[in-house]
Design a protein with these regions (language model features):
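Short, membrane-interfacial amphipathic segments enriched in basic
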Residues: 2-47, 222
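Membrane-interfacial helix-loop-helix connectors in multipass membrane proteins
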Residues: 75-99, 164-209, 213, 217-239, ...
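Active-site cofactor/substrate anionic-group-binding motifs, chiefly glycine-
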Residues: 50-106
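Selective transmembrane-helix segments that form parts of the transport pathway or gating/packing helices
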Residues: 55, 59, 63, 102, ...
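Hydrophobic alpha-helical transmembrane segments of multi-pass membrane transport proteins
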Residues: 90-128
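Short cytoplasmic-facing helical segments at TM-TM junctions of multi-pass membrane proteins
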Residues: 122-148, 230-233
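Hydrophobic alpha-helical transmembrane segments of small proteolipidic membrane proteins, enriched
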Residues: 25-29, 41, 46, 52-74, ...
């Protein structure tokens, strides 16, 4: 499949969509390999801009959301502990759910809302203005040019956000429980350590990376699928947000059903 054969009209049907997604991912992997081999130059300014867009610009929002999750978590655990004096069981269960399910999904949704939408809008704008044709004329592969720096930034920032979000969430929740129920920080930390088995850590770290790849591919499908109409830019942004959230939730469900034992 080639973008010139598609005439930048985007995929028609799910088979072409899967083909374009595979083509986009393959072009990025080939590009990364050529960069590592010293046969290609990496666009550092574009990568820095992508880091700013997908990371630093939403760090305050990420932090605020994680603080809110920590307060909610602390309040809910406090309510359970007033009825059942089983802090070990409660904290272990809640910590597992938060680390494995809630935080990766929240990080994915926030990254999709910022970096994913921005990528789709940029690609749709390049199409509408004819700049995508200019890239082809100059011998530049449009997919790797627009996607590769953003995908790498998404992967790095998704990993960093998960680590940061976990620290913030459980620091706030632990402080709440210490102040309201007297659960010692040492006991809280011990329960978290017990919940974080190697398998749990691997799953918690892999999910945001998988979600980042899905977000980038969904954004590319919507950006390329916007066509050459200026009005397609708004549709690309909306489609990316809806498609990315749907892909994240469905993938998470499939992971639970098919992979987790």
């Amino acid at each position: 499949m080639d973008l010139r054969l598609l005439n930048f009209r985007g995929p028609r049907g799910w088979i072409e969509a899967l083909g374009l997604a595979a083509l986009a991912l393959a072009s990025c992997l080939v590009f990364y390999g050529r960069v590592l081999a010293g046969r290609e130059r990496f666009d550092l300014p574009a990568f820095a801009a992508a880091l700013q867009q997908s990371g630093l610009s939403i760090l305050p929002a990420i932090t605020l959301v994680m603080i809110a999750i920590g307060l909610i978590l602390g309040h809910q655990v406090e309510g359970i502990l007033t009825q059942f004096d089983l802090p070990v069981v409660v904290i272990l269960t809640v910590a597992f759910v938060i680390i494995i399910e809630v935080l990766p999904v929240l990080v994915g949704i926030l990254v999709a809302g910022r970096a994913g939408v921005a990528l789709a809008v940029r690609q749709a704008t390049l199409l509408a203005t004819g700049e995508m044709d200019g890239l082809l004329v100059c011998g530049i592969e449009p997919l790797s040019f627009t996607l590769a720096p953003v995908l790498l930034a998404m992967l790095l920032m998704s990993f960093a956000f998960l680590v940061w979000g976990t620290l913030v969430t459980f620091a706030v929740a632990g402080a709440w429980l210490w102040a309201s129920t007297g659960v010692a920080p040492s006991l809280f930390l011990e329960m978290l350590t017990s919940a974080l088995t190697p398998g749990t850590l691997i799953e918690a770290l892999v999910k945001p990376l998988l979600f980042a790849v899905l977000i980038a591919l969904v954004a590319t499908l919507n950006g390329i699928g916007a066509g050459r109409r200026p009005g397609g830019v708004a549709g690309a942004a909306t489609g990316t947000m809806i498609g990315a959230v749907t892909a994240i939730l469905v993938t998470d469900l499939l992971y639970i059903v098919l992979v987790r034992v």
